[in-house]
């Protein structure tokens, strides 16, 4: 039976619940608490009628309720299997030369493209896997900010050639644009950025729901294996940053890399990892600690498009588990704030803009009852961090509070090398 047919049948026969969200606490994991009325089930749109544009137009709480109802129905049925898996020659990707020129290719051409770039992989390689399409200014801006941040960090550049967007209506500041603008000769590049634009082939919410995470992740993992074998890029310099559903794809890619090589990738950073709606029976799926040497996650729409489920060695919850973030009006923009926050930390001098402390809720953070040591969300996160961390953020850029974290009741551990590997 078609997965969508099963999904609709489940919606008629079963009832589910929306999540408790009032407590703003991590332990509250979207558990069912009541029943949907027959009228509510009847009024629910078909999955193929839901678009990212509609989710953006809806009030955040309303959109979150809809997404959570769909998620619970999918979990109760246990019959929704993934069926959408774009092939490597359908997934667009791009990288940049040291002068900022964009080089376009498809995923199946990654190795050939890398081999044409001088000194590719001699230093750090960051693979950015997008998880949402560039269908709005918020989506476009978030991705551009992250790309520009890495190019500034690696190549000393701010503006991506040929990609200047109109950000006149977007919140931005010098914290997202380094003050160290290039003067004269470009510095020698100290890293490479590869963007795997999976979001470009996630055309609608249905594609996201039915994405075959393990199959797509295995394809990306195989490409990374080839990058090591044929382009001499060692695993210890490969970091993945991934957005939404792509965070789980990154986990699958890293597991495939380990299966094929016996080695683990250095780091995976998840930017608001999403819920997982479809899965094959008796099959593990999703990002988890152990997929890389270090896995960190930033949750900015935990009760909306994202998930409260822990995804890494350390999970950061700005303003506590929430539907949205300060300064956002919808769950799409809230989810993308994780990308904006990471971008802010990538730029030189901003890596400690987001101090956090171990806590279970924003209230506990405010009451200074968090346990454990202080930490920094983003690129400077210590690789030995574990647990859940809470912090406060600003509504506009610069988003990081920048002030030192409050002194906690207990402090333990010694910093063992923060941020990117040497």
From Swiss-Prot:
Bias regions of kind Polar residues — which residues?
Answer: 180-189
User: Its principal location?
Assistant: secreted
* Signal sequence, start to end: 1-20
Induction or repression = By beta-ecdysone; in males.
Keywords associated with the record: Secreted, Signal
Q: Name one GO molecular function term.
A: lipase activity
What GO terms in the biological process aspect are recorded for it? lipid catabolic process
Q: What does this protein do?
A: Vitellogenin is the major yolk protein of eggs where it is used as a food source during embryogenesis.
Give the protein's recorded name. Answer: Vitellogenin-2
UniProt organism field:
Ceratitis capitata
Origin organism lineage: Eukaryota, Metazoa, Ecdysozoa, Arthropoda, Hexapoda
């Amino acid at each position: 039976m078609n997965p969508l047919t099963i999904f609709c049948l489940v919606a008629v026969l079963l009832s589910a619940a929306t999540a408790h969200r009032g407590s703003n606490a991590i332990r509250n994991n979207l558990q069912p608490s009541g029943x949907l009325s027959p009228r509510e089930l009847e009024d629910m749109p078909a999955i193929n009628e839901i678009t990212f544009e509609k989710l953006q137009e809806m009030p955040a709480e309303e959109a979150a309720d809809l997404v959570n109802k769909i998620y619970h129905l999918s979990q109760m049925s246990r019959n929704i299997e993934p069926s959408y898996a774009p092939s490597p020659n359908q997934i667009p990707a791009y990288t940049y030369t040291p002068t900022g020129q964009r080089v376009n290719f498809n995923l199946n051409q990654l190795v050939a493209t890398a081999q044409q770039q001088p000194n590719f992989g001699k230093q750090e390689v960051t693979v950015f896997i997008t998880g949402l399409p560039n269908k709005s200014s918020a989506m476009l801006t978030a991705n551009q900010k992250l790309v520009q941040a890495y190019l500034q960090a690696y190549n000393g550049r701010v503006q991506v050639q040929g990609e200047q967007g109109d950000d006149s209506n977007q919140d931005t500041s010098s914290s997202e644009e380094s003050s160290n603008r290039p003067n004269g000769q470009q510095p020698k590049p100290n890293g490479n950025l590869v963007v795997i634009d999976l979001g470009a082939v996630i055309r609608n919410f249905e594609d996201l729901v039915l994405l075959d995470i393990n199959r797509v992740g295995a394809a990306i993992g195989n490409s990374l294996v080839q990058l090591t074998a044929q382009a001499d890029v060692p695993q210890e310099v490969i970091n993945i940053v991934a957005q939404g559903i792509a965070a789980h794809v990154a986990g699958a890619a890293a597991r495939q890399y380990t299966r094929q090589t016996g080695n683990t990738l250095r780091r995976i950073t998840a930017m608001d990892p999403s819920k997982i709606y479809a899965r094959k029976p008796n099959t593990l799926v999703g990002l988890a600690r152990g997929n890389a040497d270090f896995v960190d996650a930033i949750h900015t729409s935990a009760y909306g498009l994202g998930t409260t489920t822990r995804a890494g060695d350390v999970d950061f919850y700005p303003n506590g588990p929430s539907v949205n973030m300060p300064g956002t009006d919808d769950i799409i923009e809230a989810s993308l704030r994780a990308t904006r926050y990471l971008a802010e930390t990538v730029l030189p001098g901003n890596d400690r803009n987001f101090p956090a402390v171990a806590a279970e809720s924003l209230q506990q953070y405010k009451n200074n009852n968090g346990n454990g040591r202080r930490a920094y969300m983003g690129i400077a996160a210590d690789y030995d961090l574990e647990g859940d961390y809470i912090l406060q953020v600003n509504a506009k850029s610069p988003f990081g509070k920048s002030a030192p974290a409050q002194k906690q009741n207990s402090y333990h551990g010694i910093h063992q090398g923060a941020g990117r590997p040497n």
